[in-house]
Amino acid sequence: MSGADLDNKLILGVCLGDCIHVAGLTKFLRIARQFGYQTQFIGAAVPPPVIIEKIKNSPAKIIALSYRLTPKVGLSLIKQFIHSIRHEKVIGRDYYLGCLPELAISTSKLDFFKKIFTGGEPMDEFYTIFQLESLNHTESPYPADLISRIKSKYPYPVIRAHFGLPSLDATFEGITEIAESKVLDIISIAPDQAAQEWFHHPDIIRKKPSGSGGVPIRTTEHLNALYKRSQTGNYPLLRIYSGTQDLIKNAELFHSSLHNAWAAIPIFWYSQLDGRGPLPIKNAIQDHFSAISWYALRNIPIEVNDPHQWGLRHATDQMVVADAYLSARIAKDLGVKWYIEQLMFNTPLGTSFNMDFARVLAMIDIVFPLIDENFTVFKETRTGLAYLATDPTVAKGQIAASTLFQLSVQPDIVHVVSYSEASHAATPNDVINSCKIVNTLIQDGVNNLPNYSFDKAIIKRKNELLEQAQEILEAFEVHGTHMGYENPYLSPECLSSAVRSGLFDAPQLKGFPGAKGEILTEIIDGKCVAVSSNGYEIDEEQRIRDLNIVEQMYSEENFRKQVLLND
């Protein structure tokens, strides 16, 4: 059959010789079908002459062979097969082999197979075969922006991980090592604390500690070098922390040097509220609004990394859900078109899997009504920062367990938290191995997991959270109306007042400027709830009433008016 008659979207699969191990081959064919290919499985333990005849009579462009027995015997069979292919002039095909690592070393020297698989390859190895064959290759065959990358990997999520070591040289080398491993799609550069706050102030930054919490980026050349080091392997996108001041200057610099894949900007945080920024809450919010608007004008995706910060400080589950809506609403009102909703699982520490999952579902549901043709939401999941143990063996299991639940919400982005997170800054090897764990789960489970959202206990809790989160939002809106704001979501004064008054509050905020820090919370039956000084759970309506900030919302007169309206 001539090359012109071959079907580029048809794959012929077969186990060679006496090999009966079909698991790896059938997985290869299954993944191919998910990318839109047609597949034909000839069978197991098929002699080379029979395979040759099947190939000659098939229009398949891609031929997938598997041999997972004794390498010495396999090498002899493969040499016989290659000789027959060349003798019979079965040309114009692409041949792939799955085998044991020892045999892969020998067969790679034969210069015949387009790709040899030994098991455990990252998803991008399959993507390279199945997705890129029909594309016009540029210098990088991988999409260079987040939206295209997400679409090209569907139904699989793209993978993101943090990386940044106290040494510039080690970070440069690590970026290249991670890129060449092809285990992820986005590397989030973690700059040190001095770079986040003082990059544009050289007289100050030179006096600050170097390498505290990340890589000591000090010049534009450092940023350019980071990008250059990433342009290999599967050409991962880069992104970086937005900083704690000079956000617009940072945005312009990161866009030009790193081609920043998306920006992560909070509403309340990275300010005096948590001690990680120099500005009072109100001023920080205004700066955050300006930065979000800058990115929105350029159609650069935005992640508002705010809700999980409340959860990490043991705010109630419903407060985290309310902030999920508030964050998305602000982004939409500021003109963001591509919005990334971060969903941190296992937060706060101590919540049960099912109640934690209910919170995540509530966060998704409360944002859903905002979606329209001008506002697209991508779901980004991650393992809880406080969830991981210092023992790496335990932490690996925790990553796997958390990821299984994450896949149940069909994320567009999976943020891989390295298993070393609780003990030390992730090395390239830590990042690569953590991503391998997650990639394996994704390959095995992306379309084959039970739907936990139908669990009755989860549904009940999700609905409770939606109702209580709505009470917080209604209180916030009424509070804003009393302050004279038509849209309180875009008022830094109203937002900072909501924290100052305790409407948004967390136990671990006590003592921080601009926060109340008086709420008491406990983990009860796997849920993070507000409690009285006696340890009894308080519902959200009672908590808000006790704050005395929106009294008329709960007054008898207002209640009677609402009854009359409903009648």
PLM segments and residue spans:
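Cofactor-cradling patches in redox/metallo enzymes
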Residues: L29, Q34-I116
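ATP-dependent carboxylate/acyl-activation modules
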Residues: S2-I42
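C-terminal helical cap(s) of enzyme catalytic domains, especially alpha/beta-barrels
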Residues: T128-N136, W198-K208, L279, D356, ...
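Catalytic alpha/beta active-site cores
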Residues: A45, P49, L69-K72, R93-Y96, ...
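Long alpha-helical, hydrophobic tracts
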Residues: P278-K282, N299-N433
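Catalytic-core signal marking the mid-to-C-terminal active-site face
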Residues: D430-D567
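Glycine-rich phosphate/diphosphate-binding loops that line cofactor/substrate pockets in enzymes
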Residues: M1-N8, I52-P59, R149-K153
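Surface-exposed amphipathic alpha-helices with a cationic face
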Residues: R33, I78-V90, H222-G233, S290-A296, ...
